[in-house]
Amino acid sequence: MARLKEKYLQEIRKALQAKFGYKNIMEIPKLEKIVINMGVSEATQNPKAIDNAVQDLMTITGQKPVVTKAKKSIAAFKLRQGTSIGCKVTLRGDRMYEFLDRLINVALPRVRDFHGVSPNSFDGRGNYTLGIREQLIFPEIEYDKIDKVRGMDIVMVTTAKSDEEARELLRGFGMPFREH
């Protein structure tokens, strides 16, 4: 079993129940999934660019990403409907906990000038979004093998009803929130 999953089951659940006073154990917030999205803007001119992004995301997550396509044409962006414009991966279960563990303990500390993640990136429904500027912070990515520095969005979807509950859940996992 993943280290963070064990920590959740043994410590975090009890702490959340004590703090928020849940009557039913099914009310306790839990991490549902982590979605990692990589937008590849240059894919409109160069269709091969998407392959490198897919490879990077596969190396980081250990799961094959799905290529996302444009929903509609936008002339200002030189975008046609159905063109590949990015890729995303949805992690659940043990893979999700393993990824979160690596993100918190290995990748985030490698970010330059890192003072913690923003505590304001919650969406009001208990989901947290984190933007990363470069894929190099993950140790699985080799510096010499990449063609271009790419960023990604990481969305942590929880079953929490409010941002406060979700913040406590992620803090329990060890997410380093910045103090205002």
Swiss-Prot record:
Record's GO cellular component terms: ribonucleoprotein complex; ribosome
GO biological process: translation
Keywords in alphabetical order: Ribonucleoprotein, Ribosomal protein, RNA-binding, rRNA-binding, tRNA-binding
Entry keyword Oxidoreductase: no
UniProt cross-references to SUPFAM superfamilies, sorted A to Z: RL5-like
MF GO annotations: rRNA binding; structural constituent of ribosome; tRNA binding
Subunit structure: Part of the 50S ribosomal subunit; part of the 5S rRNA/L5/L18/L25 subcomplex. Contacts the 5S rRNA and the P site tRNA. Forms a bridge to the 30S subunit in the 70S ribosome.
Known role: This is one of the proteins that bind and probably mediate the attachment of the 5S RNA into the large ribosomal subunit, where it forms part of the central protuberance. In the 70S ribosome it contacts protein S13 of the 30S subunit (bridge B1b), connecting the 2 subunits; this bridge is implicated in subunit movement. Contacts the P site tRNA; the 5S rRNA and some of its associated proteins might help stabilize positioning of ribosome-bound tRNAs.
Similarity field: Belongs to the universal ribosomal protein uL5 family.
NCBIfam families attached to this UniProt entry: PRK00010.1
Protein name, entry field: Large ribosomal subunit protein uL5
Lineage, highest ranks first: Bacteria, Bacillati, Bacillota, Clostridia, Moorellales
